[in-house]
Amino acid sequence: MEAKAKELGGGDTPPPTGKVFENTNNVNIPDAGTAVTSSVTVSGISGNAPATLQVGVDIKHTWRGDLVIDLVAPDGSTYRMKSSSSNDSADNVITTYTVNASTEVANGTWKLKVQDVARYDTGYIDSWKLTF
């Protein structure tokens, strides 16, 4: 499912320096299964994506080392943000990755691609966002 852009800011906190595109629809990640994706459609950004594209992810999972996480650009180019690690038994991936996407046109459908590569633990994409 696609999400719409929303501007963040207000109060005493300065607004972010860029425009935020977010998807808050949950996507279940099958245990030791095929990769799943969650999409956001970016529009209204001139030119290419930045060299410091911020990718915020909130993934609930009972063994985060099982997960491989990629950002997929509108042209299909894939940027690996997290590889699997059998030693990482902690829960959840709640972080922001910085991706050099400066060769990519900003506008279009971007995807977060997540795959669980080991058995016994499950989870879901809770939300994710791109900040331009």
Positions of PLM-derived features:
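Hydrolase catalytic cores
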Residues: 1-9
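Loop and turn regions of beta-sandwich accessory domains that flank beta-strands and are enriched
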Residues: 9-132
